Amino acid sequence: MSSGGLLLLLGLLTLWEGLTPVSSKDRPDFCELPDDRGPCRGIFHAFYYNPDQRQCLEFIYGGCYGNANNFKTIDECKRTCAA
């Protein structure tokens, strides 16, 4: 293969890498945890990452305990688990 062809291939692979979503091995382990309301009875809109749907979803957080897959904003969830 010519050097021009190799450069083109390298460029395409680099572009592909930038377009592919983060694999599960690159995201924190807590992103795999289920949504967890916790035992308290508050009503707080929060977001968690759903690994089956590969997106951040809203849920109601009770205000205490729960787990680390719990974000105040969808943007924070996406930056941490889906980006």
Curated annotation (Swiss-Prot):
Positions of the BPTI/Kunitz inhibitor domain: 31-81
General function of this protein: Serine protease inhibitor.
Marked site: Reactive bond for trypsin: R41, G42
Major localization listed first in the record, in broad terms: secreted
Matches recorded under InterPro entries: Kunitz_BPTI, Kunitz_BPTI_sf, Prtase_inh_Kunz-CS, TFPI/VKTCI-like
Gene source species: Pseudechis porphyriacus
GO cellular component terms given for this protein: extracellular space
Protein name (record): Kunitz-type serine protease inhibitor blackelin-2
Intracellular or extracellular location(s): Secreted
Keywords: Disulfide bond, Protease inhibitor, Secreted, Serine protease inhibitor, Signal
Signal peptide stretch: 1-24
Cysteines engaged in disulfide bonds, as pairs: C31-C81, C40-C64, C56-C77
GO molecular function: serine-type endopeptidase inhibitor activity
Keyword match Amino-acid biosynthesis: no
Family: Belongs to the venom Kunitz-type family.
Expression sites by tissue: Expressed by the venom gland.
Domain of life, per lineage: Eukaryota
UniProt xrefs under SMART domains: KU
Pfam families documented for this protein: Kunitz_BPTI
